[in-house]
Amino acid sequence: MGNIITDTIIITSDKCDIVDNDNVERIQVWLSKNILRKFQINENEPLQLIILKRFKRILLICPSHDISQHVMDASRALEMENFNFSYSLQDGQRNLTKQYLKVPESEKMFLISPPASPPPEFDFSKCEDAPQRHIQSHIQQDQQQRLEASQLLPNNPDKNNNGTFTLLKSKVGAITIDRCPTNDGNGQMQLADHVKTAFPPKSIFDTDDDD
C-alpha cells in the first residue's frame, strides 16, 4: 500500500542536526530552486517551513497535495541524501486550528515564489508606442522663447528704413546691424541686413603701431 499523500512533509535526519542553521538554509535554497521557481506560490497560500528545535525535525506545510508530491519527488536528489522526507498522517493546513494538532513552540517561515518576469498580468498583445519626435526638452523650449522674445530681427522690416538697431548689447560692447540698400541684379534696390562688428574699446596703453 502506497503512502497517503498529505500537504505536510516531515524532514528528519539521523546523520546531522536537521535544525542547524546551515541545514535549514540548505533546505531553503533547495526549495527555492526546485519548488518556488517552478510553481507560482503567493503570500496568500505560502509554503510554510516550521522548525521544531526540541523535536529535531522540520515541517513543510504545502499549499496543495500536488506541490507536496513534487517536494517528495525532488527529495530523492543526491543533495538531499542526508535528510529523510515523509508525509504526516494528516493534512496540516486543514487541522492547524485544532487543539490536538497545535504546533509546539517553533520557528516558522513563509516561503513564496519570486516575482515573475514579466508579471502574470502582462499583456503581450500590446505594442510599445513609437518615440515622440516633436517633444522638445524644457531647455530647448526656454531657448526658443528667449529667442522669440528678444526680437533680434523685425518680422517685417521697413524697406525704406536704413537705420541701425542693436543685435547684442553687454557691458563689454555691442553688436549692431546696419541696413543698407543693395542691387538685386535687376536694377531694383533692396535692403539687406548685415552684421557690423564694432571695434573693441581702445586702451590708453595702445600705440599707433597697433592700428
Swiss-Prot record:
InterPro entries: Calcipressin (IPR006931), Rcn1_fungi (IPR016523). GO terms for biological process: calcium-mediated signaling. The modification Phosphothreonine is found at T182. The modification Phosphoserine is found at S113, S117. One of its GO terms (cellular component) is cytoplasm. Keywords: Phosphoprotein. GO terms for molecular function: calcium-dependent protein serine/threonine phosphatase regulator activity; protein phosphatase 2B binding. The keyword Chaperone does not apply. Inhibits calcineurin-dependent transcriptional responses by binding to the catalytic domain of calcineurin. Belongs to the RCAN family. Present with 521 molecules/cell in log phase SD medium. This is Calcipressin-like protein.
